[in-house]
Amino acid sequence: MPLSLFRRLLLAVLLLVIIWTLFGPSGLGEELLSLSLASLLPAPASPGPPLALPRLLIPNPQACGGSGPPPFLLILVCTAPEHLNQRNAIRGSWGAIREARGFRVQTLFLLGEPMGQQFADLASESAAQGDVLQASFQDSYRNLTLKTLTGLNWVNKYCPMARYILKTDDDVYVNVPELVSELIQRGGPSEQWQKGKEPQEETTAVHKEHKGQAVPLLYLGRVHWRVRPTRTPESRHHVSEELWPENWGPFPPYASGTGYVLSISAVQLILKVASRAPYLPLEDVFVGVSARRVGLAPTHCVKLAGATHYPLDRCCYGKFLLTSHKVDPWKMQEAWKLVRGLNGRRTEPFCSWLQGFLGTLRCRFIAWLNS
């Protein structure tokens, strides 16, 4: 084979590898592309009037308290009143984690009013578990925006010292340790959330070491691009032309509602402009629209599953994925046993050398085969 032909073939192979890496299942190209979104955003909008939100029936104001430091990661799980099995599955698996990588983690469940049920069961559950937040609105899919805003407003009022907030659903498995690691890697000072600091020491450290220092903005998730509203009235994703006129074009980029992370500073900015945004029943789109109004672009993270369900796999669930969608209560427990071991302690590596080398690509390929 002539040398020039060999070089051409080698160059073609290298080019294919680069294209595959950037635009294939790895998602690296999407992550790089999302970094350019901030430069395309309009100037931030002015704050709107205070939000009119439903009153809290179970406010649980002390849920974020305690003798230790405030949560580094606060997880808000949107759930329905009747989904007790899902909540208990989370409590018995990843929701039981209170500390990851030396930082405090807190998981709370967010819901509205049950239909045709008494409140006594939820009140008893809240008294026993201490992790329920309930507000006075009808719990339904079309009220997810109201539910999410209520949760974010609770965070801003009762837990403003939390650093990151993950909004997720009760059919999502969350890899808490790896998510905390991901957030640590994405930067920002974290000394005030160090393990073991007393509240008084922590407050002093914050004022001395970080006075005048802005909390880094972050809106992280599985980003959807150029999604147009669904006009079919029967669809639960239906958005009327009154809410989103056709001449407005597609929705701005937004992170999938199955799991996205907001820094506390991003939460506060979104709450300031939310009353001026069109009230869309699709909460993830609404958050994306509100974020755009404050000049905040979503950052794509391929490790967050979005709507993708991943089959149970020790390497994927334990190392490379941060979330997996459509996980029922039984599989939630199975995933936990797979990752943690029957005795609750991991005694061997999650991944073989080859699995580790292939990383997220392998997990996405498994999901594709399963679909």
UniProtKB/Swiss-Prot annotation:
Species annotation: Rattus norvegicus
Feature: compositional bias, Basic and acidic residues: 194-207
Catalytic activity: a ganglioside GM2 (d18:1(4E)) + UDP-alpha-D-galactose = a ganglioside GM1 (d18:1(4E)) + UDP + H(+); a ganglioside GM2 + UDP-alpha-D-galactose = a ganglioside GM1 + UDP + H(+); a ganglioside GD2 (d18:1(4E)) + UDP-alpha-D-galactose = a ganglioside GD1b (d18:1(4E)) + UDP + H(+); a ganglioside GA2 (d18:1(4E)) + UDP-alpha-D-galactose = a ganglioside GA1 (d18:1(4E)) + UDP + H(+)
Glycan-modified residues: 143
An example Gene Ontology CC term for this record: Golgi membrane
Function, as annotated: Involved in GM1/GD1B/GA1 ganglioside biosynthesis.
Pathway(s) the chain acts in: Protein modification; protein glycosylation
Biological process (GO), any one: protein O-linked glycosylation
Cytoplasmic side: 1-4
Stretches of the chain found on the membrane's Lumenal side: 26-371
The keyword Cell inner membrane is annotated on this UniProt entry: no
Protein family: Belongs to the glycosyltransferase 31 family.
InterPro entries: Glyco_trans_31
Pfam families per UniProt: Galactosyl_T
Region annotation Disordered: where it falls in the sequence: 187-208
Superkingdom assignment: Eukaryota
EC number(s) on file: 2.4.1.62
Protein's UniProt name: Beta-1,3-galactosyltransferase 4
Annotated transmembrane regions: 5-25
Gene Ontology MF: a single term: ganglioside galactosyltransferase activity
Topology in membrane: Single-pass type II membrane protein
Tissue: Highly expressed in thymus, spleen, kidney and testis and, to a lesser extent, in brain and liver.
Compartments reported by the entry: Golgi apparatus membrane
